[in-house]
Amino acid sequence: MDRLQFGVFLDPRAADIGRLRDYVQEVEAAGFDYVSIQDHPYVPDFLDTFALIGTLIGQTSRLRFMPNVANLPLRPAQMLAKTSASLDLLSGGRFELGIGAGRAWDQIAGLGGPRRSPREAVAAVSEAIDVLHAMWLPGRTVSVGGRYYPLAAQTGPAPAHRIGIWLGSIGPRMLGLLGHKADGWIAPLATGYEAKPAAQERIDAAARAAGRDPASIHRVIQLVGTVTDIPYTTSRPRSGPGGQPIRTTPDIWAKIITEFAAGQRFDTVNLIPEQATSEQLRLFATEVIPLARAATSDDQA
């Protein structure tokens, strides 16, 4: 396993603009690797996620940024490719693309987006991945007669680096698509604690069927909680029905992370702080991350 990566999840609330700028600088100074930002364009109090990322990359020099996850039905793949490549160039190669098929169909339709069945949603994501890769190879004229994202255009610009496409997949068809075509899995909070191993196996089987090495696919575990001085935790970190936030000491936090990394091959941790404070960032960065990285290094030795 490569060195564990750690990120922080942000809410793009319009009322918090000043704090968001300061907060990402604190995240970077604390040593985190990336920031992920939820993308729900139909939430009135939220800023546009991509516009916010474009602003925050200018406040940082090292952090990577990723929508968690881009609402594909409201962001056509053709323009998503252009926006993503632009952000990657503007940031010097610090942008990755998380994609979601869409769930809140009433709200999506309310903004003029389509309603899609589960099967249609998977097909649309598959088609979008092909369009994204085509648009990121510059200097060509591409014609694709897709059902969801038809393309007849000159391609480009090329991003600064090979942008990873990470999916927030839940169902078996989407997990299979991920293993076949995508670069990473952002395990949704709705994926139950006990369901994660089976989901991993589905991804692995699809990857092998496509001639890919399952180990090449990144896996992100999302953990909600607070670092405390009380040695209490739950055997069911917050995911799916019955899950709970993790509220415990740094050593138990590190133990939970190590179990996900060693037992289920998650290589990236997305922290969703219950309290988005400087002190919580400091505690996680200085007391949890070193323990977790040391433990996973020992497991691989």
Language model segments and positions:
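N-terminal small/glycine-rich loop or linker at the start of catalytic domains
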Residues: 1-12, 103-109, 143-163, 220-242
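N-terminal beta1-alpha1-beta2 module of alpha/beta enzyme domains
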Residues: 1-60, 163, 274-277, 287
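Flexible, glycine-rich active-site loops centered on histidine and acidic residues
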Residues: 2-15, 73-143, 188-197
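Hydrophobic faces of well-ordered beta-strands that scaffold small-molecule active sites
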Residues: 6-10, 35-37, 64-68, 95-99, ...
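Alpha-helix-loop-beta-strand connector modules within alpha/beta enzyme cores
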Residues: 47-70, 124-131, 209, 214, ...
